[in-house]
A protein has these predicted regions:
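Structured loops at beta-to-helix junctions and adjacent beta-edge loops in soluble globular domains
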Residues: 18, 75-77, 208
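Short, intrinsically disordered low-complexity segments
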Residues: 36-133
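Intrinsically disordered, low-complexity regions enriched in Ser/Pro/Gly/Gln/His and often acidic
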Residues: 7, 63, 114-117, 163, ...
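Short, extreme N-terminal segment that most often corresponds to the first beta-strand
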Residues: 1-33, 214-219
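Residues that form generic nucleotide/phosphate-binding pockets
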Residues: 28, 102, 106, 183
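Long, compositionally biased intrinsically disordered terminal regions
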Residues: 73, 121, 128-219
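Short aromatic/hydrophobic-glycine micro-motifs
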Residues: 31-34, 109, 186, 193
Length: 219
């Protein structure tokens, strides 16, 4: 991993794509204008967008070098919610699931994750070989979707948990996002300076950015 690697991951959404090729990811996700960027440059840009005018957090994503066999794509564009609300930084979980399905058709496995403690917003959507095998999204302590077979880490959390509501519905949190992500692929914050990265990272524009006509911004 490059010496400039930065691993403070908080309040963020991301994709994990098995052995994903950057150019193909850009194509499949309808991204554009990829420019080479280091970890520091890419992540700083994505995080800075969050504090800019409404919708900026949806404008760019950072495609990381290949780490432990996975290519991560980080940015608010992958936040799975109940419906599209782009200026508020949200997209329908159905659209995120469709993107995971598409990516897994090409690369074998793809997952989407949201870890937002302050917003009580957590999700994991897992796909293999062109099929979404698990969807779990909770927002403001409301479970929006709970379909498919739970991952082993999730099943254990459910068995050990006392966080069921009055209706007996389990409500996952950020710890579960971490554990499911780690089981399925890699959890970004558990990478470190000794983690070997392969290839380059890229900062790319989302369809939302192009629609608004925001000029290309360099890292």
């Amino acid at each position: 991993m490059a010496k400039d690697a930065w691993f403070q991951f908080e309040d963020i959404s991301w994709l994990a794509v098995k052995k994903g090729d950057p150019a193909r990811i850009v194509e499949l996700l309808s991204l554009s204008g990829p420019v080479e960027a280091s970890w520091n440059e890419g992540l700083s840009a994505v995080y800075d967008d969050y504090f800019n005018p409404k919708g900026d957090q949806m404008s760019r994503v950072y495609i990381t070098p290949l780490v432990q066999g996975w290519r991560l794509v980080l940015g608010g564009w992958f936040g799975a919610s109940s419906e599209d609300h782009l200026e508020g930084g949200q997209r329908s979980y159905r659209k995120i699931a469709a993107e995971c399905r598409k990516l897994s058709t090409v690369f074998g496995q793809a997952g989407a994750f949201t870890l937002q403690w302050r917003m009580v917003w957590f999700s994991w959507i897992l796909a293999r070989e062109g099929k979404v095998v698990r969807q779990y999204v909770v927002e403001d302590e409301e479970v929006l979707v709970d379909s498919g077979r739970p991952a082993a880490a999730e099943a254990k959390a459910r068995a050990d948990s006392e966080s069921e509501d009055e209706d007996g519905e389990w409500c996952g949190d950020g710890v579960d996002v971490v554990n499911v992500a780690q089981e399925f692929s890699v959890f970004p914050e558990r990478l470190g300076a000794k983690t070997k990265g392969v290839g380059k990272g890229f900062l790319a524009l989302t369809p939302w950015d192009r629609k608004r006509g925001v000029p290309v911004r360099r890292p």
